[in-house]
Amino acid sequence: MTLSFFDQFMSPTYLGIPLIAVALTLPWILFPTPSTRWLNNRLITLQGWFINRFTQQLLLPLNLGGHKWAVLLTSLMLFLITLNMLGLLPYTFTPTTQLSLNMGLAVPLWLATVIIGMRNQPTAALGHLLPEGTPVPLIPVLIIIETISLFIRPLALGVRLTANLTAGHLLIQLIATAAFVLMPIMPTVAILTSIVLFLLTLLEIAVAMIQAYVFVLLLSLYLQENV
């Protein structure tokens, strides 16, 4: 069987059973559980500080009606960061490189924000489809364009996360393969390539965290329009 660079994105199976469910559930074990002690350890304290700062930054532009989403959005943020970071380890599988998973997260959450807007303030929600002061001949065209842009939002959420992580993983694999092949032929070039690989890995770690933040931030912006 001919191997491909895209084989790393295939869902692994064991005895015919897809292991993507294990890849989605096991990362929760890595999160520390708070204890009943007055003083927690450094890891729990750092985790609490991060969640507190992120929640404040996320909910700052939202009114009180959107604050009930704090637990959901914060949990989603930590979940995506964990999956993205664990996928950078060797011989691991990154579930967030699958468009089906990302669309499964993006579509229901986006649809929930739209339903909330239609239920709480239907006039304002429908008003987003037609900007104020639009000339009468352009009204049908603008309504169609705004409707299309509304339905493209979940697709943009899922494709953005998938494309960024897939591109980073492919670059890492290409440069790592080049360094491995060049080592016996041109050791100096191979060492320089390995340095580039190390720097790219650091960049991919930042991308893994930033993309999770962008995913949740865009959801909060969609929520802001409808609460």
UniProtKB/Swiss-Prot annotation:
Q: Name one GO biological process term.
A: proton transmembrane transport
Q: What is its main location?
A: mitochondrion
Q: Which Gene3D superfamilies match?
A: ATP synthase, F0 complex, subunit A (1.20.120.220)
User: Gene Ontology terms, cellular component aspect?
Assistant: mitochondrial inner membrane; proton-transporting ATP synthase complex
Report the membrane topology from the UniProt record.
Multi-pass membrane protein
InterPro entries named among the record's database cross-references? ATP_synth_F0_asu, ATP_synth_F0_asu_AS, ATP_synth_F0_asu_bact/mt, F0_ATP_A_sf
* Family annotation (NCBIfam families): ATP_synt_6_or_A
Family under the similarity heading: Belongs to the ATPase A chain family.
This protein is called ATP synthase F(0) complex subunit a
Gene designation per UniProt:
mt-atp6
